[in-house]
């Protein structure tokens, strides 16, 4: 591309127009794959997104209102028990301690204070203690099911991967959403 532009700047206008028409036909054929509505559910996609106003209509912004998304995997369909077990196995193999937390609201808000850096909803209620020394996902899944029995009707439940050497949360994903 750079060599074509450089050669077009040096040559006569006739040669430049010939070079640009050759390149524009190639560019059009490349951009022909960028069509809006190629993926299924076009009408649903358009109701939840907004266009950025440019001619490339496939770049859109996700509508943030009345369309809550919570954690890392919340854009996917609800995870099956096997998928949850694989995610928890990854947390355990990474050397992180699985933790289970629950919360009624499930989102980060700013209601209690307007100070910079203050947000409500960052800290959820912990279910029991972090599972330090846990070696299998089955025990974590049992604890999740026990938490669902008590709080599943009205609370969001998430699983964390906590790195106790760095004292940070390394992974977090929703494992249960309440029926609204």
From Swiss-Prot:
Annotated protein name in UniProt: Ribulose bisphosphate carboxylase small subunit, chloroplastic
Keyword annotations of the record: Calvin cycle, Carbon dioxide fixation, Chloroplast, Photorespiration, Photosynthesis, Plastid, Transit peptide
Note: The basic functional RuBisCO is composed of a large chain homodimer in a 'head-to-tail' conformation. In form I RuBisCO this homodimer is arranged in a barrel-like tetramer with the small subunits forming a tetrameric 'cap' on each end of the 'barrel'.
UniProt cross-references to InterPro entries, sorted A to Z: RuBisCO_ssu (IPR024681), RuBisCO_ssu_dom (IPR000894), RuBisCO_ssu_sf (IPR036385)
Function, as annotated: RuBisCO catalyzes two reactions: the carboxylation of D-ribulose 1,5-bisphosphate, the primary event in carbon dioxide fixation, as well as the oxidative fragmentation of the pentose substrate. Both reactions occur simultaneously and in competition at the same active site. Although the small subunit is not catalytic it is essential for maximal activity.
Pfam families for this protein: RuBisCO_small
The keyword Iron is annotated on this UniProt entry: no
CDD domains given in the database record: RuBisCO_small (cd03527)
Cross-referenced HAMAP family: RuBisCO_S_bact (MF_00859)
Keyword field contains Chloroplast: yes
Organism (species): Marchantia paleacea (Liverwort)
Encoding gene per record: RBCS
Gene Ontology CC annotations of this record: chloroplast
Gene3D superfamilies recorded: Ribulose bisphosphate carboxylase, small subunit
Family the entry assigns: Belongs to the RuBisCO small chain family.
Gene Ontology terms describing biological process: photorespiration; reductive pentose-phosphate cycle
């Amino acid at each position: 591309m750079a060599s074509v532009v450089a050669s077009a700047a040096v040559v006569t206008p006739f040669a430049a127009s010939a070079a640009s028409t050759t390149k524009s036909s190639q560019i059009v054929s490349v951009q022909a794959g960028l069509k809006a509505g190629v993926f299924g559910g076009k009408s649903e996609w358009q109701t939840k997104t907004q266009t950025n106003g440019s001619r490339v209509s496939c770049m859109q912004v996700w509508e943030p209102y009345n369309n809550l998304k919570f954690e890392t995997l919340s854009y996917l369909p609800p995870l099956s028990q096997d998928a949850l077990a694989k995610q928890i196995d990854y947390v355990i193999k990474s050397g992180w301690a699985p933790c289970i937390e629950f919360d009624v609201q499930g989102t980060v808000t700013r209601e209690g204070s307007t100070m910079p850096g203050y947000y409500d909803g960052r800290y959820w209620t912990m279910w029991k203690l972090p599972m330090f020394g846990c070696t299998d996902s089955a025990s974590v899944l049992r604890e999740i099911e026990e938490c669902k029995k008590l709080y599943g009707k009205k609370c969001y439940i998430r699983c964390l991967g906590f790195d106790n050497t760095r004292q940070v949360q390394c992974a977090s994903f929703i494992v249960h959403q309440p029926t609204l």
